[in-house]
Amino acid sequence: MSDSNLTNPIKAFFHDEFPEQYQEPPGLQKNMKPVPDCGEKSYKGSGKLTGRKALVTGGDSGIGRAAAIAYAREGADVAINYLPEEQPDAEEVKELIEAEGRKAVLIPGDLSDESFCQDLVKQSHHELGGLDVLALVAGKQQAVENIEDLPTEQIYKTFEVNVFSLYWVVKAALPYLPEGASIITTTSVEGYNPSPMLLDYAATKNAIIGFTVGLGKQLASKGIRVNSVAPGPIWTPLQISGGQPTENIPKFGQGTPPAPLNRAGQPVELADVYVFLASENSSYVTSQVYGITGGIPTA
């Protein structure tokens, strides 16, 4: 028998039923029950990103928050983007980044606006003194059971936030990105196995896969790598603010189909992948998608 202190992954994080809950979108992480684990108390860095300059969209909560915290603890200065309504969560992230002795830049705004995306990149580059990591995590997800009830306005907005903003941010950032820079997008298991109530969201996540693979090939000659992360059911404000029907929240991650690990993932469980893809440890990795799904297939 091994003497190592291993943990059963089924029990590594919260694995009971969640309380039924709902917040008006976009929702605040600080008001969730339980509050998602983004590594605030557990993530320990080792200098993998010393001196780097990162922009993280959706950096106030959930997966983006976990990436921002990890980047700071690995030695990077970090700019985060979020919606103005998410300011309370963003202020917490700012404190966590600055506690590591790193610079934190808060830039609220709506990614569905192309001009804002351009300004976001310019401000990030100016205030950080450079830019060499784009972690594009922000997303919009609203469940609608029947296509007849899916508003055209929602379809447009979901594509603008989830897909169009990637084009706008990357186009604005390319003049600043040096050789060795890394672009990380965020797709989803929904891009491979769509839920019937997430037609617009799933379509955007499939589009992100094509965008990532193609852009990685296009930018390889410039020495810029492009990869994506495909989360499974992760406990974030996206889920409790309309991303899932309220009645599905208690068994989120345990529903149909369930993750084989039979629980929702926590944002901190993706942090190492965002660090790896930003760091030189992934120097031979581009145009790839990394699934962090609790065992749900991505093929």
Curated annotation (Swiss-Prot):
EC number: 1.-.-.-
Region ranges (Disordered): 1-44
SUPFAM superfamilies recorded: NAD(P)-binding Rossmann-fold domains
Superkingdom to which the source organism belongs: Bacteria
Assigned keywords, A-Z: Oxidoreductase
Keyword Oxidoreductase attributed: yes
InterPro entries associated with the record: NAD(P)-bd_dom_sf (IPR036291), Sc_DH/Rdtase_CS (IPR020904), SDR_fam (IPR002347)
List of catalytic residues: Y201
Residues annotated as binding substrate: S188
Presence of keyword Oxidoreductase: yes
Residues reported in the UniProt entry to bind NADP(+): 55-79
GO molecular function, one term: oxidoreductase activity, acting on the CH-OH group of donors, NAD or NADP as acceptor
Homology family: Belongs to the short-chain dehydrogenases/reductases (SDR) family.
Protein name per Swiss-Prot or TrEMBL: Uncharacterized oxidoreductase YhxD
Organism listed in the record: Bacillus subtilis (strain 168)
Origin organism lineage: Bacteria, Bacillati, Bacillota, Bacilli, Bacillales
